[in-house]
Amino acid sequence: MAKAYDHLFKLLLIGDSGVGKTCLIIRFAEDNFNNTYISTIGIDFKIRTVEIEGKRIKLQVWDTAGQERFKTITTAYYRGAMGIILVYDITDEKSFENIQNWMKSIKENASAGVERLLLGNKCDMEAKRKVLKEQADKLAREHGIRFFETSAKSSMNVDEAFNSLARDILLKSGGRRSGNHSKPSSTDLKPSDKKNTNKCSLG
Protein backbone atom coordinates (compact mmCIF):
# COMPACT_ATOMS: atom_id res chain seq x y z
CA MET A 1 0.00 0.00 0.00
CA ALA A 2 1.39 3.39 -1.06
CA LYS A 3 2.21 5.97 1.57
CA ALA A 4 -0.33 8.75 1.96
CA TYR A 5 2.45 11.34 1.74
CA ASP A 6 5.86 11.88 0.12
CA HIS A 7 7.55 13.86 2.90
CA LEU A 8 7.04 14.46 6.62
CA PHE A 9 8.17 17.84 7.96
CA LYS A 10 8.25 18.74 11.64
CA LEU A 11 7.45 22.42 12.20
CA LEU A 12 7.62 24.34 15.48
CA LEU A 13 5.90 27.53 16.58
CA ILE A 14 7.76 29.54 19.20
CA GLY A 15 7.21 32.94 20.74
CA ASP A 16 5.94 34.61 23.88
CA SER A 17 2.87 33.31 25.69
CA GLY A 18 -0.36 34.83 24.41
CA VAL A 19 0.74 35.73 20.87
CA GLY A 20 -1.70 33.25 19.32
CA LYS A 21 0.44 30.19 18.53
CA THR A 22 -2.22 27.66 19.47
CA CYS A 23 -4.89 29.59 17.57
CA LEU A 24 -2.67 29.66 14.47
CA ILE A 25 -2.08 25.91 14.62
CA ILE A 26 -5.78 25.17 15.03
CA ARG A 27 -6.66 27.55 12.19
CA PHE A 28 -4.11 25.90 9.90
CA ALA A 29 -4.78 22.27 10.83
CA GLU A 30 -8.54 22.38 11.41
CA ASP A 31 -9.66 25.66 9.78
CA ASN A 32 -11.27 26.59 13.07
CA PHE A 33 -10.98 29.42 15.57
CA ASN A 34 -11.74 29.44 19.28
CA ASN A 35 -10.90 32.24 21.67
CA THR A 36 -11.24 29.98 24.70
CA TYR A 37 -7.74 29.43 26.02
CA ILE A 38 -6.98 26.00 27.44
CA SER A 39 -3.39 25.50 28.52
CA THR A 40 -2.21 22.05 27.51
CA ILE A 41 0.20 20.02 29.59
CA GLY A 42 3.38 19.00 27.83
CA ILE A 43 3.86 19.09 24.06
CA ASP A 44 1.01 18.94 21.60
CA PHE A 45 0.91 18.86 17.81
CA LYS A 46 -1.52 18.90 14.90
CA ILE A 47 -1.15 17.38 11.45
CA ARG A 48 -2.21 18.58 8.02
CA THR A 49 -1.16 17.27 4.62
CA VAL A 50 -0.72 19.78 1.79
CA GLU A 51 0.37 19.48 -1.83
CA ILE A 52 3.41 21.49 -2.90
CA GLU A 53 5.35 21.13 -6.15
CA GLY A 54 3.36 17.98 -6.92
CA LYS A 55 4.43 16.35 -3.65
CA ARG A 56 2.18 15.46 -0.72
CA ILE A 57 3.75 16.97 2.38
CA LYS A 58 2.61 15.86 5.83
CA LEU A 59 3.17 18.78 8.20
CA GLN A 60 3.48 17.91 11.87
CA VAL A 61 3.03 21.28 13.60
CA TRP A 62 4.16 21.40 17.22
CA ASP A 63 2.87 23.73 19.91
CA THR A 64 4.87 24.67 23.00
CA ALA A 65 1.76 24.13 25.12
CA GLY A 66 2.56 26.99 27.46
CA GLN A 67 6.10 25.87 28.26
CA GLU A 68 7.49 29.29 27.29
CA ARG A 69 5.88 30.76 30.42
CA PHE A 70 8.19 28.64 32.55
CA LYS A 71 11.32 28.95 30.37
CA THR A 72 11.39 25.18 30.00
CA ILE A 73 11.54 24.77 26.23
CA THR A 74 14.30 22.23 25.85
CA THR A 75 16.61 20.97 23.15
CA ALA A 76 14.35 17.91 22.86
CA TYR A 77 11.53 20.14 21.59
CA TYR A 78 13.75 21.45 18.79
CA ARG A 79 15.14 18.03 17.86
CA GLY A 80 14.24 17.00 14.33
CA ALA A 81 12.56 20.31 13.50
CA MET A 82 12.95 21.25 9.85
CA GLY A 83 11.15 24.57 10.11
CA ILE A 84 10.51 27.06 12.92
CA ILE A 85 7.93 29.86 12.91
CA LEU A 86 8.71 32.74 15.28
CA VAL A 87 5.45 34.39 16.32
CA TYR A 88 4.84 37.81 17.86
CA ASP A 89 1.67 39.82 18.46
CA ILE A 90 1.45 43.07 16.45
CA THR A 91 -0.38 44.66 19.41
CA ASP A 92 2.34 43.69 21.91
CA GLU A 93 5.70 45.41 21.40
CA LYS A 94 7.43 43.28 24.05
CA SER A 95 6.56 40.08 22.18
CA PHE A 96 8.31 41.54 19.11
CA GLU A 97 11.37 42.62 21.08
CA ASN A 98 11.65 39.10 22.48
CA ILE A 99 11.95 37.63 18.97
CA GLN A 100 15.70 38.25 19.27
CA ASN A 101 15.75 36.00 22.36
CA TRP A 102 13.85 33.31 20.46
CA MET A 103 16.36 33.61 17.60
CA LYS A 104 19.10 32.98 20.15
CA SER A 105 17.21 29.96 21.48
CA ILE A 106 17.03 28.52 17.95
CA LYS A 107 20.75 29.04 17.47
CA GLU A 108 21.52 27.29 20.76
CA ASN A 109 19.09 24.38 20.43
CA ALA A 110 17.99 23.72 16.86
CA SER A 111 19.83 22.05 14.01
CA ALA A 112 22.13 24.31 12.02
CA GLY A 113 20.46 25.64 8.89
CA VAL A 114 16.89 25.02 10.06
CA GLU A 115 14.40 27.05 7.99
CA ARG A 116 12.86 29.97 9.90
CA LEU A 117 9.96 32.31 9.28
CA LEU A 118 8.84 35.45 11.15
CA LEU A 119 5.13 35.85 11.71
CA GLY A 120 3.24 38.85 13.12
CA ASN A 121 -0.13 37.62 14.35
CA LYS A 122 -3.44 39.41 15.13
CA CYS A 123 -3.30 41.72 12.11
CA ASP A 124 -7.11 41.92 12.36
CA MET A 125 -6.52 44.21 15.37
CA GLU A 126 -5.03 47.06 13.33
CA ALA A 127 -6.41 49.75 15.64
CA LYS A 128 -4.30 48.35 18.50
CA ARG A 129 -1.12 47.88 16.44
CA LYS A 130 2.12 48.61 18.31
CA VAL A 131 4.61 46.97 15.93
CA LEU A 132 4.97 48.51 12.48
CA LYS A 133 5.13 46.12 9.54
CA GLU A 134 8.32 47.90 8.42
CA GLN A 135 10.03 47.04 11.73
CA ALA A 136 9.35 43.34 11.31
CA ASP A 137 10.25 43.40 7.63
CA LYS A 138 13.62 44.94 8.54
CA LEU A 139 14.25 42.29 11.22
CA ALA A 140 13.37 39.49 8.80
CA ARG A 141 15.73 40.89 6.16
CA GLU A 142 18.54 41.12 8.74
CA HIS A 143 18.13 37.41 9.47
CA GLY A 144 17.52 36.46 5.84
CA ILE A 145 14.10 34.94 6.49
CA ARG A 146 10.56 35.40 5.19
CA PHE A 147 7.98 37.51 7.01
CA PHE A 148 4.17 37.38 7.06
CA GLU A 149 1.46 39.16 9.01
CA THR A 150 -1.42 36.84 9.82
CA SER A 151 -4.72 36.62 11.62
CA ALA A 152 -5.79 33.34 13.18
CA LYS A 153 -9.20 34.96 13.64
CA SER A 154 -9.84 35.78 9.97
CA SER A 155 -7.41 33.16 8.56
CA MET A 156 -5.55 35.86 6.60
CA ASN A 157 -2.16 34.58 5.35
CA VAL A 158 -2.18 31.56 7.68
CA ASP A 159 -2.08 28.94 4.91
CA GLU A 160 0.30 31.11 2.90
CA ALA A 161 2.81 31.33 5.75
CA PHE A 162 2.84 27.61 6.58
CA ASN A 163 2.97 26.58 2.92
CA SER A 164 5.77 29.02 2.16
CA LEU A 165 7.89 27.51 4.91
CA ALA A 166 7.07 23.97 3.75
CA ARG A 167 8.07 24.85 0.19
CA ASP A 168 11.40 26.29 1.34
CA ILE A 169 12.10 23.09 3.29
CA LEU A 170 11.15 20.96 0.28
CA LEU A 171 13.45 22.89 -2.03
CA LYS A 172 16.29 22.75 0.47
CA SER A 173 15.88 18.99 0.87
CA GLY A 174 16.12 18.47 -2.89
CA GLY A 175 12.45 18.55 -3.88
CA ARG A 176 11.35 19.53 -7.36
CA ARG A 177 12.21 23.17 -8.02
CA SER A 178 9.62 25.48 -9.53
CA GLY A 179 10.33 28.33 -11.91
CA ASN A 180 9.75 30.93 -9.20
CA HIS A 181 9.74 29.99 -5.53
CA SER A 182 9.99 33.54 -4.21
CA LYS A 183 6.22 33.67 -3.85
CA PRO A 184 4.34 31.82 -1.12
CA SER A 185 3.27 28.36 -2.19
CA SER A 186 -0.12 27.68 -3.65
CA THR A 187 -1.79 24.47 -2.55
CA ASP A 188 -4.92 22.52 -3.23
CA LEU A 189 -6.39 23.95 -0.04
CA LYS A 190 -8.26 27.22 -0.27
CA PRO A 191 -8.25 29.89 2.48
CA SER A 192 -11.37 30.06 4.60
CA ASP A 193 -14.04 32.63 3.82
CA LYS A 194 -15.56 32.26 7.27
CA LYS A 195 -16.03 35.38 9.37
CA ASN A 196 -15.40 35.10 13.09
CA THR A 197 -16.25 37.63 15.75
CA ASN A 198 -14.03 36.30 18.51
CA LYS A 199 -10.55 37.60 19.23
CA CYS A 200 -7.60 35.29 19.78
CA SER A 201 -5.97 37.13 22.65
CA LEU A 202 -4.34 34.06 24.08
CA GLY A 203 -2.68 31.01 22.69
From Swiss-Prot:
Residues modified to Cysteine methyl ester: C200
S-geranylgeranyl cysteine: lipidated positions: C200
Short motif (Switch 1): ranges: 31-45
Motif interval(s): Switch 2: 63-80
Main location per the UniProt record: membrane
Cofactor section: Mg(2+)
PTM per Swiss-Prot/TrEMBL: Ubiquitinated via 'Lys-11'-linked ubiquitination on Lys-46 and Lys-58; impairing the recruitment of guanosine diphosphate (GDP) dissociation inhibitor 1/GDI1.
Annotated GO CC locations: bicellular tight junction; cytoplasmic vesicle; endocytic vesicle; insulin-responsive compartment; lamellipodium; lateral plasma membrane; neuron projection; plasma membrane
Modified residues (Phosphoserine): S178
Reaction it catalyzes: GTP + H2O = GDP + phosphate + H(+)
Compartments reported by the entry: Cell membrane; Cytoplasmic vesicle membrane; Cell junction, Tight junction; Golgi apparatus, trans-Golgi network membrane
Assigned protein family: Belongs to the small GTPase superfamily. Rab family.
Recorded domain comment: Switch 1, switch 2 and the interswitch regions are characteristic of Rab GTPases and mediate the interactions with Rab downstream effectors. The switch regions undergo conformational changes upon nucleotide binding which drive interaction with specific sets of effector proteins, with most effectors only binding to GTP-bound Rab.
Function text: The small GTPases Rab are key regulators of intracellular membrane trafficking, from the formation of transport vesicles to their fusion with membranes. Rabs cycle between an inactive GDP-bound form and an active GTP-bound form that is able to recruit to membranes different sets of downstream effectors directly responsible for vesicle formation, movement, tethering and fusion. RAB13 is involved in endocytic recycling and regulates the transport to the plasma membrane of transmembrane proteins like the tight junction protein OCLN/occludin.
Full protein name: Ras-related protein Rab-13
